[in-house]
């Protein structure tokens, strides 16, 4: 785990960057001609303390969107069959909905769909928030919610929601639920700008653009650097960061 990244000597003339990191209880340091910081934006100011104050402030702007992906294993999906549905949208409940997983198709592998008497996985999604607050404050409240919520609360809410949605189809949680897996993501997804809450910055002046500016032999790449929570954006930022170092032979 990297703990400190700094230029060896003055940033303007440094020929190397030193990275201090920990592994198995010991601390090590390694030097390189260029470094790409690909961690979360909000962690970078703590790791690279020499960054300009304005850049640190920009890196702290975004707040990760907390998420919960819950998977419920059912012994059968007779209740879905009887109701003639594959999922239920419920934006006012603890999870915003539930839906049966589609059979996987990976490479040459093709899962064989089972009948209503066969087991099935059901996916649920929750985005903890606090309505009425600005979006970043809602995300912070969501972080706290995920850190303090017990599994018992999740289980009771899930069982209740399944009964409300599938009870008319004969669903019985004590009989039909085989297992529950709750994947909590307090760190969640990269913050994306919203015109309801965020200013309309001129080109080049948004926090993600200021935050990802090259600093000597250090560049920055991650989905936060694009203010977009998608793999393609992270790849684009990685390409940019490497090119910034390669274009002037820094590496």
Label every model-predicted segment:
Residues 1, 8, 37-38, 221:
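Generic beta-strand/beta-sheet core signal
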Residues 1-18:
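A conserved short coil-to-beta-strand element within the FAD-binding core of flavoproteins
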Residues 2-5, 32-33, 40, 120, ...:
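C-terminal substrate/ligand-recognition segments
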Residues 11-12, 25-27, 54, 248-251:
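Secondary-structure transition/capping motifs at alpha-helix termini
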Residues 12-13, 29-30, 63-65, 115-118, ...:
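Extracellular/periplasmic catalytic domains that process cell-envelope and extracellular macromolecules
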Residues 17-92:
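Glycine-rich loop(s) and the adjacent beta-strand/alpha-helix scaffold that form part
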Residues 22, 73, 79-251:
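Conserved flavin/dinucleotide-binding core of flavoenzymes
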